[in-house]
């Protein structure tokens, strides 16, 4: 049975660039590549900047979907993203992605980390591997 750790491992090590889908203020879909994912306190986190349109879209419509793929395998993660303003959560993510420190700092007003709540992740494969679903 799949776990949140399986989803994390795929995002972090197998398909480190994934697509994040949001909805803009007019209800139009918006999709862009993302590259941050980590587990902190048992939750799946991503990171962005508060000044970005993607963050404004998440605040207005927190239901998002991620699609990460490698070859014939992919995970789709659908759920609500919840901002976490705690310094320790921001520091954890930035320590996991030290290259981001050129643009972000856990003490600045721009850095934000978000975790998935009420999420469902579905694994699919065109290579004959069994489909799996995990929720948290």
Predicted regions and their residues:
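Structural motif
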Residues: 17, 43, 63, 74, ...
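Charged, amphipathic alpha-helical segments
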Residues: 1-6, 48, 98-99
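A short mixed-secondary-structure module that forms the rim of ligand-binding clefts
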Residues: 37-71
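Charged, gly/pro-rich active-site loop segments
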Residues: 76-136
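A short, Trp-centered hydrophobic/proline-enriched beta-strand micro-motif
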Residues: 10-25, 64-66
């Amino acid at each position: 049975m799949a776990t949140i750790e399986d989803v994390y491992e795929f995002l972090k090590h197998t398909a480190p660039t994934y697509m994040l889908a949001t909805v803009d203020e007019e209800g139009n879909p918006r999709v862009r590549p993302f590259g941050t994912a980590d587990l902190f306190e048992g939750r799946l986190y991503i990171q962005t900047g508060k000044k970005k349109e993607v963050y404004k879209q998440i605040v207005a419509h927190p239901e998002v979907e991620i699609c990460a793929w490698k070859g014939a395998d992919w995970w789709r993660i659908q759920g609500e993203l919840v901002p976490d303003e705690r310094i320790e959560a921001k520091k954890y993510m930035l320590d996991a992605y030290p290259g981001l420190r050129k643009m972000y700092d856990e003490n600045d007003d721009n850095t934000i980390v978000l975790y998935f709540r009420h999420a469902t992740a579905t694994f699919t494969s065109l290579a004959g591997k069994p489909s799996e679903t995990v929720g948290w």
